[in-house]
Amino acid sequence: MPDYRSKTSTHGRNMAGARGLWRATGMKDEDFGKPIIAVVNSFTQFVPGHVHLKDLGQLVAAEIQAAGGVAKEFNTIAVDDGIAMGHDGMLYSLPSRDLIADSVEYMVNAHCADAMVCISNCDKITPGMLMAAMRLNIPVVFVSGGPMEAGKVKFRGDEKAIDLVDAMVVAADDSYTDEEVAEFERSACPTCGSCSGMFTANSMNCLTEALGLSLPGNGSIVATHANRKKLFLKAGQLIVELAKRYYEQNDASILPRSIATKAAFKNAMTLDIAMGGSTNTVLHLLAAANEAEVDFTMDDIDELSRRVPVLSKVAPAKQDVHMEDVHRAGGIMAILGELDRANLLDVSVPTVHEKTLKDALDKWDIIRTEDPEVYEFYRSSPGGVPTQVAFSQNRYYSTLDGDREKGVIRNAEHAFSKDGGLAVLYGNIALDGCIVKTAGVDESILKFTGTARVFESQDAAVEAILGNEIKAGDVVVIRYEGPRGGPGMQEMLYPTSYLKSKGLGKDCALVTDGRFSGGSSGLSIGHVSPEAAEGGAIGLVEDGDTIEIDIPNRTIHLNIDDATMAHRRTVQEAKGWHPKEERKRKVSKALKVYAMHTTSAAKGAVRVL
């Protein structure tokens, strides 16, 4: 039977000094011997998805104490991708994922904590904490801050639901007046929480449900609803139970690596494909699997993408549907339930809250349960009042959305499309693969042939788009923006949003070794691997080349012959793999260190030492 890890610093005469310091934090004689639970918070006033988390750590801590544990809270950093977008701040976003994972490891191991509750929410914070959980392999429960309510704007006689991306699109569209743009800006982000569509933050918080590491509703119930408080209270109680099961009953089945097995990672990716999640989830699941020593690769994602249908379309794929609508339809447990009925899941896998995923679905899927409390939980609605306060309203929808034929969540028979919401493409421009969010691609351009317009940075591409230099039929190629070449693998939300604002969303493609925001839509192909900085063929594309994209057949091809490709490679290798023009970009020592050790997107941009 394993000893509590914390015993290292709480027992024995030689630990008198350490106990003295523990006492100075408030511990008493009776606390030595109880499990010490790290409450890993990520509160910051910089990020709307985290601005309401300040007191929630202590809410969890109180439940831990009441359940017989000792709670010790600490904080990680949190970068807001939306605020960092469009300038050099975005260079720091993906590297912050590794920094978060390391900081959690440092704090937990330095102080010999026995278990963790991870309070996350936004883009790189949930993945960073997930990587740490897999690395440490001690009992853990994830609970996120929850989605923001969708914005509402009265526009030219109609009221419509909007989000951050809508504000960006109208700002770049000259047909909108300054007053109209200002109204969208003021209305797009009305409350605390992660941005309201199926963007990266919400995608990842949904995937923790599929991985079995968080409670039902974690990914979908809005941050402002009083029922979300129940998740935090339950997380505090549950983590003490899990810690005691492992350390006192020798039950290793509740450890993260026992729960997040390859089958669980495949379940999570299946969910992601079915709900049209952010392409960034591919990076993060690959990275988490790497930490868990699970053999989960791009080949697995490719195989799943060919047989999993799209069962839900949420903004940005469907602009009038947001996370609050997904919750009303039964949330992630409802999507998982439909996938189970289509025999697309392994429901034998365990979760932190039920013995198996099947047990969880029997209890929480609104189609199969008869529990009125579950129905009420999923009727939790937005409050419609701007606020930065968690759990500040208690409004309910009058009915659930159980329509699986035409509703927000469909069954497999009535899927939005039989092909999944994500696809892996291969070809001579991406030998190790690239990713496209097919749920956001119009059917008319699933096959697209266009003329390359090559840019050595996102900034140069944005300037060309706003300068009306990009025309219908162009393929915008943005390179040297990968994990190493950026460094930091910037998101390309501005280029995709500006293409949409120029009326080119269905007439152009964008191909990059960078990545896309979860808010991106259109024919946006990212994660091209190998990246240009590693000698990838994207670094050999020239203006005027023809690029063929065939999503149904999963291919992307640069139309030049092998001899021309070989000649270009010889010339480029002599020059070195770097942008043709010097970029106005300050790369700090911290970013240079990141670039030295990171790998390609096809491997999750994980560190190799």
UniProtKB/Swiss-Prot annotation:
<feature type="binding site">
    <location>
        <position position="123"/>
    </location>
    <ligand>
        <name>Mg(2+)</name>
    </ligand>
</feature>
<dbReference type="Pfam" id="PF24877">
    <property type="entry name" value="ILV_EDD_C"/>
</dbReference>
<feature type="modified residue" description="N6-carboxylysine">
    <location>
        <position position="124"/>
    </location>
</feature>
<dbReference type="GO" id="GO:0004160">
    <property type="term" value="F:dihydroxy-acid dehydratase activity"/>
</dbReference>
<feature type="binding site">
    <location>
        <position position="195"/>
    </location>
    <ligand>
        <name>[2Fe-2S] cluster</name>
    </ligand>
</feature>
<keyword id="KW-0479">Metal-binding</keyword>
<dbReference type="InterPro" id="IPR004404">
    <property type="entry name" value="DihydroxyA_deHydtase"/>
</dbReference>
<dbReference type="InterPro" id="IPR000581">
    <property type="entry name" value="ILV_EDD_N"/>
</dbReference>
<protein>
    <recommendedName>
        <fullName>Dihydroxy-acid dehydratase</fullName>
        <ecNumber>4.2.1.9</ecNumber>
    </recommendedName>
</protein>
<dbReference type="Pfam" id="PF00920">
    <property type="entry name" value="ILVD_EDD_N"/>
</dbReference>
<keyword id="KW-0001">2Fe-2S</keyword>
<comment type="pathway">
    <text>Amino-acid biosynthesis; L-valine biosynthesis; L-valine from pyruvate: step 3/4.</text>
</comment>
<dbReference type="GO" id="GO:0005829">
    <property type="term" value="C:cytosol"/>
</dbReference>
<keyword id="KW-0411">Iron-sulfur</keyword>
<keyword id="KW-0460">Magnesium</keyword>
<dbReference type="GO" id="GO:0009097">
    <property type="term" value="P:isoleucine biosynthetic process"/>
</dbReference>
<dbReference type="InterPro" id="IPR037237">
    <property type="entry name" value="IlvD/EDD_N"/>
</dbReference>
<dbReference type="GO" id="GO:0009099">
    <property type="term" value="P:L-valine biosynthetic process"/>
</dbReference>
<dbReference type="InterPro" id="IPR056740">
    <property type="entry name" value="ILV_EDD_C"/>
</dbReference>
<keyword id="KW-0456">Lyase</keyword>
<dbReference type="GO" id="GO:0051537">
    <property type="term" value="F:2 iron, 2 sulfur cluster binding"/>
</dbReference>
<dbReference type="InterPro" id="IPR042096">
    <property type="entry name" value="Dihydro-acid_dehy_C"/>
</dbReference>
<feature type="active site" description="Proton acceptor">
    <location>
        <position position="517"/>
    </location>
</feature>
<keyword id="KW-0028">Amino-acid biosynthesis</keyword>
<feature type="binding site">
    <location>
        <position position="491"/>
    </location>
    <ligand>
        <name>Mg(2+)</name>
    </ligand>
</feature>
<comment type="function">
    <text>Functions in the biosynthesis of branched-chain amino acids. Catalyzes the dehydration of (2R,3R)-2,3-dihydroxy-3-methylpentanoate (2,3-dihydroxy-3-methylvalerate) into 2-oxo-3-methylpentanoate (2-oxo-3-methylvalerate) and of (2R)-2,3-dihydroxy-3-methylbutanoate (2,3-dihydroxyisovalerate) into 2-oxo-3-methylbutanoate (2-oxoisovalerate), the penultimate precursor to L-isoleucine and L-valine, respectively.</text>
</comment>
<comment type="subunit">
    <text>Homodimer.</text>
</comment>
<comment type="similarity">
    <text>Belongs to the IlvD/Edd family.</text>
</comment>
<feature type="binding site">
    <location>
        <position position="81"/>
    </location>
    <ligand>
        <name>Mg(2+)</name>
    </ligand>
</feature>
<dbReference type="InterPro" id="IPR020558">
    <property type="entry name" value="DiOHA_6PGluconate_deHydtase_CS"/>
</dbReference>
<comment type="pathway">
    <text>Amino-acid biosynthesis; L-isoleucine biosynthesis; L-isoleucine from 2-oxobutanoate: step 3/4.</text>
</comment>
<keyword id="KW-0408">Iron</keyword>
<feature type="binding site" description="via carbamate group">
    <location>
        <position position="124"/>
    </location>
    <ligand>
        <name>Mg(2+)</name>
    </ligand>
</feature>
<feature type="binding site">
    <location>
        <position position="122"/>
    </location>
    <ligand>
        <name>[2Fe-2S] cluster</name>
    </ligand>
</feature>
<keyword id="KW-0100">Branched-chain amino acid biosynthesis</keyword>
<dbReference type="GO" id="GO:0000287">
    <property type="term" value="F:magnesium ion binding"/>
</dbReference>
